[in-house]
């Protein structure tokens, strides 16, 4: 099969190709979808079996009335500080509308931070470290920086990896596709990022997010005995 990627292009229309007008997709198979795009050469129509479209999301703040109350908005959404407090002291904003992490678990953490601030209590959550999860099969999860990003940030970064195919529990489950990659600082051993593809990746990422938040080193993770057989052993093995 052939996969064609077209990014940052305006879409004029998209529809089912229909039995009467269906043509052939790039690999010669029967096309079932049709999309009209605009590129440097003008408007053209593409036909394929499937379309994957990532349209993105933007905050709808114009109807909130925050501007009238003296609040400040940005292109990303409503501006809020680390306590989720806006420029209007009695108004707080959490979650997607702030334009930071558009994730449910991040929004929950924002809410707790806002409530703690209102109640005059300290909040210890580290909302700079937020894992992202994709609930496909195999699952995908990531937190922190990639190897390239870590090096660009000035770290002497290294990466350890372990194939899921070599993990006993994954083989038992019949889900042996994927890997665990852990990015760390070569001198300090600090975990800078982690990227997982495979069974239970969305569960395993919490261990690595905790390591980053608690400043646990890769040596300490590797020295922790992980039970056998479990998918979590892949985290330990990526460090070994």
Task: Name every feature range the model reports, one short phrase each.
Residues 123-139:
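Flexible, acidic loop-helix segments that line cofactor/substrate-binding pockets
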Residues 105-128, 155-156, 214-218:
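Internal hydrophobic alpha-helix adjacent to the cofactor/substrate pocket in enzyme cavities
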Residues 40, 80-82, 185-186:
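Short, acidic, Ser/Thr-enriched surface-loop or helix-capping motifs
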Residues 26-29, 54, 99, 135-145:
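Short beta-strand to alpha-helix junction loop
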Residues 119, 135-240:
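Flexible, glycine-rich terminal cap/loop adjacent to redox cofactors
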């Amino acid at each position: 099969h052939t996969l064609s990627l077209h990014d940052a292009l305006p879409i004029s229309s998209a529809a089912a190709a229909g039995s009467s007008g269906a043509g052939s997709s790039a690999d010669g198979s029967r096309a079932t979808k049709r999309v009209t795009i605009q590129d440097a050469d003008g408007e053209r129509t593409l036909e394929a079996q499937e379309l994957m479209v990532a349209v993105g999301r933007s905050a709808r703040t114009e109807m909130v009335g925050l501007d009238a109350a003296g609040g400040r908005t940005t292109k990303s959404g409503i501006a809020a500080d680390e306590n989720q407090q806006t420029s209007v002291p009695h108004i707080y904003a959490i979650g997607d509308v702030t334009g930071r992490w558009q994730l449910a678990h991040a929004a929950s953490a924002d809410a707790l931070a806002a409530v703690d601030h209102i109640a005059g209590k300290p909040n210890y959550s580290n909302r700079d470290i937020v894992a992202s999860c994709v609930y496909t099969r195999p699952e995908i999860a990531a937190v922190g920086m990639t190897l390239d990003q870590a090096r660009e940030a000035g770290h002497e970064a290294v990466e350890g990896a372990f194939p899921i195919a070599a993990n006993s529990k994954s083989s038992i489950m019949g889900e042996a596709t994927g890997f665990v990659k852990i990015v760390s600082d070569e001198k300090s051993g600090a975990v800078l990022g982690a990227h997982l593809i495979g069974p239970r990746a969305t569960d395993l990422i919490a261990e690595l997010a905790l390591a980053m938040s608690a400043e646990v080193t890769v040596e300490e993770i590797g020295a922790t005995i992980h039970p056998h057989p479990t998918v979590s052993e892949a985290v330990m093995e990526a460090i070994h």
